[in-house]
């Protein structure tokens, strides 16, 4: 008696969570024999026109034989993928190997309700990858000429497609080896989808906060609950959409997210640890578009916590949601039409052009505090926490298209996908400075809660990768703020030539030595500035010296480093510096040694009201810190020139 043939080994590595064109998520996996009823249900929901486009005839139902043929595959000569949301199939793509073993015929069937979301392109990408793995080099397809949507999928895939019309059918054929164009198409699709998914989280039309205590719980637990703080900050920050409170312990709140009665764009979850999985599932069932989990724990708590965290991501993605956290400090979007402070910051941060991303809560809080203390303003702030789903890569995709963000700052404790990070950072750095603070041990040991692999590359290789990507690599939070305050307020330095102005010969020498160590060239020095006689006499002198230096053809940047002058305030000096920098279009920095000004933070962005409007100039208490920050931007502009020399957008 012969043994029945063994069931083909299921290729788990082909499964993937995917982001659709509108930013929602779905799950892609190989089809299974157990999918018979799901395929039957999918087919019964299709319109006559969609069925005709797929089968070239109308089939009101699929026979049992057809269903078995469609669902029983060998994952080699016959491969099929399904895309699911909440367990329901919304798209099917398949290939069947032809007598020529290097060629396979490909076909797609997309749910009427989900057409236009990019499912066909995603299925084609994954089918091509599986086919290449199985030794197939070419796809063919037969498409009715009126099926313009499917023809467009092939035409826009980036392959060299040959076509001919025969007997009322368009026959297509193309090699599936990746080309430069097909890679660009895939990266562009990925970029648009991921950027849009983050935009939905940072610009929600509605927000709900789930959590809190019973109204009569008092303050025995130490003040407001996490949910109450987040809710208060949302309202106080002036969020422009509706804010819903969900707390089953409070009769004046909605008992569940479903009870809100409308789809909520962003749900903030601040419930006890053991309630988080069920709460995420409830949000998915209610059709919520994204969740932010402020509750800590999970991967921080060892293997069982890691398993639970992965379960949260599966639930969210299966329900079409993106997930920030767990252990997230929140997100901020200062755009006036949004005004979202879904964070633990008690007041809405000042609006500006710096985008900020951090991972673990502790370092995220330190980074945010340091940049706020410097007087920097923000476009968006994202704390990813354990970054179980949304990561720095996603945020960079968003920043690339965000007109509100001119400078990007990231504090990284780990990089889950260095190759993708390098590709995205390089593309982003072509248009905006990308400042990355990382420890020298990045990649060698994961921080608690970061459920990603550690890179096997040595630290030196990671640094080289960052340099080649155009990233401005710094080592500390303070260094990130040092560079950011120049980048957000000044023009980029055109080169390394520096003019030094000072009222102290000793300080001028210190700056010159520091500049030489940083490969900057001091081409002009004015070390005998006399700024006495009060503002009326001193400021015009300062302005004259500054403009003379800035207008010099051998000067790219100017630094003013000085000891205190009794008759001049930091604010008065800053106003003159800012005006001159704006007038000429070259960067100006100020290093104040020994200054104590109760009204102004000397080490930070110095703001001034001028005749040209509100302007600012970067201030430092250490000349060395100022020079190091400037040198980092000089290296960036040199990289930018090299990159633009051989890159065509």
Give the label of every model feature segment:
Residues 177, 181-649:
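Catalytic-core regions of core metabolic enzymes
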Residues 1-198, 204-207:
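Long, contiguous binding/interaction regions
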């Amino acid at each position: 008696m012969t043994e029945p043939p063994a069931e083909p080994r299921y290729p788990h590595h082909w499964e993937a969570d995917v982001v659709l064109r509108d930013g929602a998520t779905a799950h892609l996996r190989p089809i299974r024999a157990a999918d018979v009823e799901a395929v039957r249900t999918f087919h019964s929901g299709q319109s006559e026109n969609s069925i005709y486009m797929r089968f070239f005839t109308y089939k009101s139902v699929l026979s049992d034989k057809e269903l078995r043929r469609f669902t029983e595959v060998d994952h080699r000569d016959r491969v099929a993928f399904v895309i699911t949301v909440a367990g329901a199939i919304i798209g099917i793509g398949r290939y069947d190997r032809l007598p020529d073993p290097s060629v396979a015929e490909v076909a797609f069937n997309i749910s009427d309700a989900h057409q236009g979301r990019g499912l066909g392109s995603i299925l084609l990408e994954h089918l091509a990858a599986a086919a290449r793995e199985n030794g197939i080099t070419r796809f063919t397809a037969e498409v009715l000429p009126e099926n313009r949507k499917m023809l467009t999928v092939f035409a826009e895939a980036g392959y060299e497609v040959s076509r001919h019309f025969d007997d009322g059918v368009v026959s297509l054929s193309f090699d599936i080896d990746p080309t430069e164009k097909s890679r660009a198409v895939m990266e562009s699709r990925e970029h648009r989808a991921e950027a849009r998914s983050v935009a939905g989280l940072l610009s929600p039309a509605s927000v709900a906060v789930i959590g809190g205590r019973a109204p009569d719980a008092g303050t025995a637990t130490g003040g407001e609950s996490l949910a109450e703080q987040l809710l208060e900050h949302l309202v106080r920050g002036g969020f422009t959409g509706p804010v819903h409170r969900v707390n089953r312990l409070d009769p004046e709140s909605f008992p569940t997210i479903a009870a809100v009665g409308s789809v909520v764009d962003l749900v903030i979850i601040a419930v006890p640890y053991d309630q988080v999985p069920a709460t995420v599932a409830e949000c998915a069932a209610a059709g919520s578009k994204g969740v932010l989990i402020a509750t800590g724990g999970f991967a921080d708590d060892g293997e069982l916590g890691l398993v639970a965290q992965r379960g949260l991501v599966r639930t969210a993605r299966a329900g079409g949601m993106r997930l920030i956290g767990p252990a997230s400090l929140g997100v901020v979007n200062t755009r006036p039409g949004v005004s979202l402070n879904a964070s633990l910051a008690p007041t809405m941060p000042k609006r500006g052009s710096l985008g900020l991303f951090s991972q673990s809560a502790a370092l995220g809080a330190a980074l945010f505090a340091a940049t706020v203390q410097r007087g920097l303003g923000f476009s968006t702030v994202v704390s990813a926490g354990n970054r179980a789903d949304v990561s720095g890569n996603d945020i960079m995709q968003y920043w690339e298209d965000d007109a509100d963000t001119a400078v990007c700052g990231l504090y990284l404790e780990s990089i889950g996908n260095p190759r993708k990070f390098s590709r995205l950072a390089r593309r982003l750095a072509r248009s905006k400075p990308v400042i990355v603070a990382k420890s020298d041990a990045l990649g060698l040991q994961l921080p608690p809660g970061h459920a990603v692999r550690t890179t096997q590359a040595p630290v030196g290789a990671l640094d080289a990768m960052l340099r080649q990507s155009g990233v401005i690599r710094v080592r500390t939070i303070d260094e990130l703020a040092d560079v950011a305050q120049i980048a957000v307020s000044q023009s980029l330095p055109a080169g390394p030539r520096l003019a030094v102005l000072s009222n102290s010969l000793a300080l001028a020498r210190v700056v010159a030595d520091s500049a030489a160590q940083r490969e900057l060239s001091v081409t002009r020095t004015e070390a005998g500035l006399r700024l006495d006689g009060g503002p009326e006499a001193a400021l015009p002198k300062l302005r004259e010296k500054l403009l003379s230096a800035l207008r010099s053809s051998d000067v790219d940047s100017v630094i003013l480093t000085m000891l205190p002058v009794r008759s001049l305030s930091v604010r008065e000096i800053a106003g003159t510096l800012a005006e001159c920098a704006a007038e000429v279009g070259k960067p100006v920095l100020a290093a104040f040694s020994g200054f104590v000004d109760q009204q102004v933070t000397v080490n930070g962005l110095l703001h001034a009201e001028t005749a040209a409007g509100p302007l600012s100039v970067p201030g430092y208490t250490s000349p060395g810190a100022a020079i190091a920050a400037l040198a980092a931007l000089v290296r960036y502009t040199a990289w930018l020139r090299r990159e633009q020399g051989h890159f065509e957008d």
